[in-house]
Amino acid sequence: MRRKKFVSMLLVATMAATLFAGCGNDSGKKGSSGGAKEFDAFFAVPGSEINDDNEIQKIIEEKTGVRVKETWLTGQTADEAVGTMIAGGEYPDFIDGISGQKQLYDAGALVPLDDYIEKYPNIKNLFTELEWEKLRQDDGHIYWIPQFSCIKGDEKVCTHNDEAFWIQARVLKWAGYPEIKTLDQYFDLIEKYNEANPTMADGTENIPYTILCEDWRYFCLENAPQFLDGYPNDGSCMVDPDTKKVLDYNTSDTAVEYFKKLNEEYNKGIVDPESFTQTYDEYISKLSTGRVLGMIDQWWDFAYTAGDAIKQAGLDEQGCDYIPVPVTIDGRDNQWHNAGGAFNASTGLAVTTSCDDVDAAMKFVNDLLDQDIHNLRYWGVKGTDYEVDENGEFYKTADERKKASDTAYKASHSCPYSYFPQYNGTSDDGINANKPDGQAREFYDGLNSDVKEVFDAYGVKTYVEMLGTNNAPGDWYPMWSFSNNFTTDTPGGAAWTKIGELKHAELPKVVMAKDFDSAWDTYMDKYNACNPQDFLGELQTELDKRLEQAAKFK
């Protein structure tokens, strides 16, 4: 079985959000309907609430004897939310603390899962022996299960869930579907389109280019240089595939060119002046109106919220959907999309010490991975959410597709348990994708008309084909699965924290500066004072360790 995929937050927007205060522990209590066992869960990411009488959740409850009340992050950072829990000593039954996961482990709040992994075959079969080994902590035990890192059977992928430069379909159509390969070409097209078409059909002014910078999502500003140099998403660094050495994208020639370009575009009025103060919700709201012509972001960060809103508002008819274009600094090939995804060992679903029936909790995780229940989670109910043709292939009608993007319908009907372990790839039937967005025919048939026009013009059928596919970079990949768990307990972690704080404070000033060269020099002086060699050194040590570990399993 092949696997992986951290779509990291690939399904952030399909999830539900209630107040963090709702995370009290009720594990083991019987529900009022049918005597189902009830657990609670907290995931340190934002989302949207589902209804208490959700229809598919009820079906899953009938099949498993369990229901889980999921709560999500609101009004705090992940680290703040986790810190509050640790201070109080009370936890939900299930948790994914995201950037706060290591805090939970260090606080002794998590239960070792080794015995349960061996007991329940669906869980055990998620990963290879090497991948399970990567999850062992310094005490030798496994405490969490990555949710998005399993590709079951043959890989089926149509979307690019990672980072890219995105541009609206209407811009490409207006220009006659040109080849966009460089950063200069990208911004030149946005400038020309906005000059010729400064407003939407209703007179609302376009926003040519916006940047999301809030909290951890400031990757939309700071890490573009690695992609512009054509590298895959190692997150905290670049890795030379030949020498296996860590490279610092923050100080590269491309970093200078990129931020200088942003500075020029800001001073031309192309970059949204609210970029550095807007919240994530405000950013999604802007995208949802169709006003934003382009941005850099990861698919999972906007597609399931803004994308659905664009469809529901009929803005696809104006060409407001987003298309990825393979922009690099000088037109070189990119390695953005990789076959096999990425294994994220830094966090995952954990069970806490507050859970009074760990075995039942883990049995539920195992049950959620039964194929029929997995189909309920991601395809829905046959005859209501999807149909089956004479060859056994799943598909949706136009009405079913419309319902699937409707917020109210999702709240009342859909229950993906989206931060529990799941499959990408191929169903046990050998025919269907485990999720609709991997089903090639259904994916293409369900595209908005403006996206279809773009794909037809470029001779492609998927977002992936717009960018190209590459083999997995190497056994070290991805390095962000290490740096995500940096703490200030090590020199490298302390340097990483200082650099993050510096970027938040100084990179907006660089972009807005009247004198770019002076602002960049000041930023570099401050950057070097953070001792980046410490975090780069720890990254190199981890990279070497991963290569050595992988060699033992070959």
Which positions does each model-derived feature cover?
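Carboxylate/His-rich catalytic cores and anion/metal-binding grooves
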Residues: 108-136, 190-194, 204-239, 244, ...
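Helix-loop-helix "hinge/cap" segment bordering the ligand-binding cleft or interdomain interface
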Residues: 141, 146-219, 240-286, 291, ...
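Conserved N-terminal structural module of periplasmic/extracytoplasmic solute-binding proteins
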Residues: 8, 23-185, 197, 223, ...
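Ligand-binding "clamshell"
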Residues: 103-116, 141, 198, 305-335
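Polar, glycine-rich mid-to-C-terminal structural blocks
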Residues: 319, 324-326, 337-408, 412-415
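Conserved small-residue motifs centered on glycine
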Residues: 374-505
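C-terminal motif of bacterial Sec signal peptides marking the signal peptidase cleavage site
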Residues: 18-22
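Positively charged n-region of N-terminal signal peptides that target proteins for export
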Residues: 1-6
